[in-house]
Amino acid sequence: MNKKTSGQAIAWLICALVAAAQYGNFYVYDSIGPVADLLQQQRGFSDTQVGLLNAIYSLPNVVLILVGGVLVDRFGAAKMTVSTAAVCLAGALLTAFSPDFTGMAAGRLLFGIGAETFSIATLAAITDYFSGGKLAFAMGLTLSIGRLGSYSADMSPDWFSHAYGQGWQPPLLIAAAVAGTSFAAGLLYWWIDRPARRSAAARRANAERFVLRDLLHFGRAYWYLLALCVLWYSVILAFRSTFSIKYFQHVHGLDLATAGAMNSYVFLAAVFATPAFGWLCDRVRRYAPFLALGALLLPVALAIMTLSSLSLWVATALIGVSYSLVPAVMWPLTSKLVKPNRFGTAIGLMWVVQNAGIAGANMVAGWLNDRAGASAQNPAGYDAMMVFFGTASTIGAACALILWLTAGRRQQEAAAQPA
């Protein structure tokens, strides 16, 4: 095996380890939704409290995600991957073993503190080992395998029915065990990366400072994209990760296992479709039209789910396409709208606002459900939540359409000069 072949093998091994670590991260994040009904039945949690368990994940990242990027640049991807994976594991354990809501919320907060910086670190890890045409594919592959963690969390009521039959805690203990495998993968990556520490040093030397005045240089197209980012992610993650399984059970009469399976297909479709959509957009060199299509599918799917008698499979399929298409296009398009030396600032700002939006959407949706008395006995109580999600996703789709019409025509994308 020559040096080049050996280097490629190590790169793909790192990719596999990072993907395995991301799998655990996604699983733990989505572990609350499947036990939401059990938490209400056995521990008396309200919808507001259940929503807060996911909302609190995002709250620290309104600020800390900027700090996390600086720490990754300073200490390197490998060290930050393993250290933040350890924080995530501690958060998952605290969530599973806490005797009350306050302890569980503290565990989810701790998990959130580690998880987003963990994601930045794994992104930097892929960047260290891949370049050129393979970079996007490696990132897409890592994200896709990570999303299998969300699929697995949704399928866990079926796969681990015995654990769910024993109450709310065993499923969360399984999530903590999965977080342990994530930490183990991160630790192995850190050990393999030891000879390549100079890569981290080079990245630290080239790191750019976050300067607030750089925001003044972004064009209107970027702000349309940022608005779509916060609205679209807030709706799809708050609904899918927190409330969808209960909604399917109480409004559409599904049992827990079937509701979890229905919800899981959104992520299962994205596992295969996201890299494919990314390849297609690169192939035809068009981004804004695909982004507008993906954004528009979300309010359409929510309307079908709420207002029509069509099968839930239709709505979940449309959500799956939206969840595959929008992320595949959003991040490459961002690189076309801002200059390379401002790309980190642009992404950092988008993630900050996105986390604030996700936290807010979870809390608002939970409050609306509690206010309306949403339950299996009162399925109409979920209407206010669905109107909220539908309105936000429609505004997001409008931003995507405006972006397409003002800066996303074929000739404009071909001649794009980052602002």
Region locations from a protein language model:
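Juxtamembrane intracellular "pre-TM" segments in multi-pass secondary transporters
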Residues: 2-8, 193-226, 419
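Residue-level signature of mid-helix packing/kink "hotspots" within the transmembrane helices
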Residues: 30, 58-66, 150-151, 267-275, ...
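Extracytoplasmic gate region of multi-pass secondary transporters
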Residues: 32-34, 220-274, 361-362
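Conserved MFS/SLC helix-loop-helix module at the cytosolic interface between two early adjacent transmembrane helices
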Residues: 63-102
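Helix-to-loop junctions at the C-terminal end of transmembrane segments
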Residues: 64-76, 273-286, 369-370
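Cytoplasmic helix-loop-helix junction between adjacent transmembrane helices
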Residues: 101, 107-146
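Helix-loop-helix hairpin linking two adjacent transmembrane segments in secondary transporters
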Residues: 141-194
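C-terminal transmembrane helical hairpin of 12-TM major facilitator-type secondary transporters
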Residues: 287-333
